[in-house]
Amino acid sequence: MSIQIFCDFDGTITNSDNITSIMEHFAPPKAEEIKKQILAQELSIQEGVEQLFHLLPTNLHDDMIAFLKNNASIRSGFQEFVQFINKNDLSFYVILGGMDFFVHPLLDGLVPKEKIYCNETDFSKEYIEVKWPYPCDKHCNHHCGLCKSTLIRRLSSQQDFRIVIGDSITDLQAAKQADKVFARDFLITKCKEYHIPYTPFHTFYDIQNELQHLVEVKL
């Protein structure tokens, strides 16, 4: 048995949700309606995210990256948390419903690319098209887009101690599979609704302190 850590990015590693920031700054008002439908589970995550990004012209590529580099901030304690993970030789993956064009620049130097699982974007046409390299397997029918629960099944075994760190509806199916959940914001609401045990967190220092105890017990 080993400890396997699966961490969200938007609103978890970063202090704000980068997709939300992009939509608020660059997208037309229709984006807000689509976002509400996703959170209310009236639209699948895949359908909603696809619709959101198709609102954005591809000629905004450089502007969006520059905007996020200037405005996105990494949550306190994350760099030290990564050092702790590496020191203890723990398996750590970033799995997110966000896009390659912004996650790789923001995590450059912090997390190796091969440990990041995200959606891909096509900028070859007038509007952004989303590619879905990690779809749901036969055990999931939630049309997740990037299916976190499928990736967890692929990257770990049931004998492993699975930890999920997240903040939103996109982390719910993953949380259902976890042995331990660190949650904040809307994921706390969903954990309460589905009676999923969770530990709240504000910074990665909070998670590291809890994880230190787990490492001592599990390893």
UniProtKB/Swiss-Prot annotation:
InterPro entries: HAD-like_hydrolase_phosphatase (IPR050849), HAD-like_sf (IPR036412), HAD-SF_hydro_IB_MtnX (IPR017718), HAD_hydro_PyrdxlP_Pase-like (IPR006384), HAD_sf (IPR023214). GO terms for molecular function: 2-hydroxy-3-keto-5-methylthiopentenyl-1-phosphate phosphatase activity. Signal peptide: none annotated. Disulfide bonds: none annotated. Keywords: Amino-acid biosynthesis, Hydrolase, Methionine biosynthesis. Gene3D superfamilies: 3.90.1470.20, HAD superfamily/HAD-like. One of its GO terms (biological process) is L-methionine salvage from methylthioadenosine. Dephosphorylates 2-hydroxy-3-keto-5-methylthiopentenyl-1-phosphate (HK-MTPenyl-1-P) yielding 1,2-dihydroxy-3-keto-5-methylthiopentene (DHK-MTPene). NCBIfam families: DKMTPPase-SF, HAD-SF-IB, PRK09552.1, salvage_mtnX. Belongs to the HAD-like hydrolase superfamily. MtnX family. This is 2-hydroxy-3-keto-5-methylthiopentenyl-1-phosphate phosphatase. It comes from Bacillus cytotoxicus (strain DSM 22905 / CIP 110041 / 391-98 / NVH 391-98). The lineage of its organism: Bacteria, Bacillati, Bacillota, Bacilli, Bacillales. The gene is mtnX.
